[in-house]
């Protein structure tokens, strides 16, 4: 990597000047799209070696805290880069538009996807995987780093080979901490968040909880705390009992269940540490975890759970933009009140000022979470459709006449079915590139005829999934946009196309 110049330009993320990325790398295909940036394959000109380049648009960094978050992520990646199961950072670059993080490329796919594609899976394999994950957690904690967003999507295999290494890849929510220090901001992903995070007072023990949730899912195909809504999920996390009675748990070893119990203890003080978990007999003794394949139903559930339903997300946006004045209530006026420059979009500063005007005392990090959750297309602003989708009551969204409107949007030729070509067209319109359409169809296509009819579409829309791949929670127990502005549900069944003029 080029030696950085220690002079820091104004309005920059990095505390030093850097060479131009394109002087040293050729950018290739897009590998993935995240909440804050896009990852590309890149090739180093001097060596022809391939790397991954995460490019973060600076327009999405709307406050000084965002700049500090990116710089902290880079520092933490350097801090952990010698660990064999952490993606190694190669270098950082910055120009007037982007911050680029060049790192080791992982071409073996996500944790759950690899398991599903293998077609069989055993307790012993689960023990090896969770040992790797706990090893990363132990390393983080020993170096004074709290991850705060452990989930399967943040673990990739470095190659497609059978002996590929599992590597932690995303440290965007990670922070440095001191022993005995507590944090208070609500971050993470719904299924994996620890109860003390929801109570807004927590320490590094939250990472062990998240790893325990991953282990439960590895062995059963479903999360331990489940509900139709995110607020329901959080209630289960705070109060629910762990289910070890349903299939496949009667066939799972007592050692596995004992470790999960200890990792999912609601008391952080009683919860097992990462080091103690690594010393648990189920992990240490290679014969304690049986090598026989788990029930195939586990893999089936795992596949369903690991796929975010993008069609549902698009459909909610379509419905939100077609509701009537009466059904929308005062939301149009609220949008116009927040959008002070009448640009048709809400920026972070406008959202913050709007919340202040209605007497909200949310912290800046919480407002940023609201912004991220509502920004469906990752543009860095909230347009009118996104605002409605974030603030309207779900009962309005699920009314049949609104579902008909949404279905018709996808069913371009009016055949009564959504085909893969029509889905491709919709994805293009929504800017969802490189989306596995076959998997999206199969997820909803109950009769396996290769297309989606209205009854299948309706079942999908009314099914609670709660799966979120964003770095923040869409609706948590403490706040969402609707609650922040005091928006209440009103009853109406009319519909029409409307937008603020």
Swiss-Prot record:
The UniProt record gives the binding positions of Ca(2+) 1 as: 339, 341, 343, 345, 350
Could you tell me the Gene Ontology terms of the biological process aspect for this record?
A: positive regulation of abscisic acid-activated signaling pathway
Pinpoint the Protein kinase domain residues. 25-283
Supply the InterPro entries for this chain: CDPK_Ser/Thr_kinases, EF-hand-dom_pair, EF_Hand_1_Ca_BS, EF_hand_dom, Kinase-like_dom_sf, Prot_kinase_dom, Protein_kinase_ATP_BS, Ser/Thr_kinase_AS
UniProt keyword list: ATP-binding, Calcium, Cytoplasm, Kinase, Metal-binding, Nucleotide-binding, Nucleus, Phosphoprotein, Repeat, Serine/threonine-protein kinase, Transferase
PROSITE patterns xrefs:
EF_HAND_1, EF_HAND_2, PROTEIN_KINASE_ATP, PROTEIN_KINASE_DOM, PROTEIN_KINASE_ST
Name the reaction it catalyses: L-seryl-[protein] + ATP = O-phospho-L-seryl-[protein] + ADP + H(+); L-threonyl-[protein] + ATP = O-phospho-L-threonyl-[protein] + ADP + H(+)
Subcellular location, in the record's words? Cytoplasm; Nucleus
Question: What domain of life is recorded for the organism?
Answer: Eukaryota
Enzyme class per UniProt: transferase
Question: What are the residue boundaries of the EF-hand domain, all occurrences included?
Answer: 326-361, 362-397, 398-433, 437-467
Q: Which residues form the active site?
A: 149
Phenotype seen when the gene is deleted: Mutant cpk4-1 shows reduced ABA and salt responsiveness in seed germination.
GO terms for cellular component: cytoplasm; nucleus
According to the record, the residues making up region (Autoinhibitory domain) are 289-319
Query: Which residues make up the binding site for Ca(2+) 2?
Result: 375, 377, 379, 381, 386
The entry lists its GO molecular-function terms as: ATP binding; calcium ion binding; protein kinase activity; protein serine kinase activity; protein serine/threonine kinase activity
Q: What functional role does this protein have?
A: May play a role in signal transduction pathways that involve calcium as a second messenger. Functions as a regulator of the calcium-mediated abscisic acid (ABA) signaling pathway. Phosphorylates ABA-responsive transcription factors ABF1 and ABF4 in vitro. Phosphorylates the nuclear zinc finger Di19 in vitro.
Q: What is this protein called?
A: Calcium-dependent protein kinase 4
Q: What species is given as this protein's source?
A: Arabidopsis thaliana (Mouse-ear cress)
Gene name of the encoded protein: CPK4
